[in-house]
Amino acid sequence: MKLIIFTGLVLFAIVSLIEAQAENEKACLPQYQVCTDAPGNCCSDLVCDCYGRYKCGARIGRNCFCLQKGVIYKREN
């Protein structure tokens, strides 16, 4: 009986470890991908930058993209 309980606990520990590893190895979002709904999923060398969208002075939405850290993007006319 003790062997069955011990075996069950060991199997449970192995399954938990496998699930934790899979969670840590989630695919990250590459550069220029939309991260509006997942701001923490950009790859390690990127940051999720968000910008407000305006039309006639009224805010109509928000866009977020995975961009390089420390890079400033300016609008060109």
Swiss-Prot record:
<feature type="propeptide">
    <location>
        <begin position="21"/>
        <end position="26"/>
    </location>
</feature>
<protein>
    <recommendedName>
        <fullName>U8-lycotoxin-Ls1a</fullName>
    </recommendedName>
</protein>
<keyword id="KW-0964">Secreted</keyword>
<keyword id="KW-1015">Disulfide bond</keyword>
<comment type="similarity">
    <text>Belongs to the neurotoxin 19 (CSTX) family. 08 (U8-Lctx) subfamily.</text>
</comment>
<dbReference type="GO" id="GO:0090729">
    <property type="term" value="F:toxin activity"/>
</dbReference>
<keyword id="KW-0732">Signal</keyword>
<keyword id="KW-0800">Toxin</keyword>
<dbReference type="GO" id="GO:0005576">
    <property type="term" value="C:extracellular region"/>
</dbReference>
<dbReference type="Pfam" id="PF10530">
    <property type="entry name" value="Toxin_35"/>
</dbReference>
<feature type="signal peptide">
    <location>
        <begin position="1"/>
        <end position="20"/>
    </location>
</feature>
<dbReference type="InterPro" id="IPR019553">
    <property type="entry name" value="Spider_toxin_CSTX_knottin"/>
</dbReference>
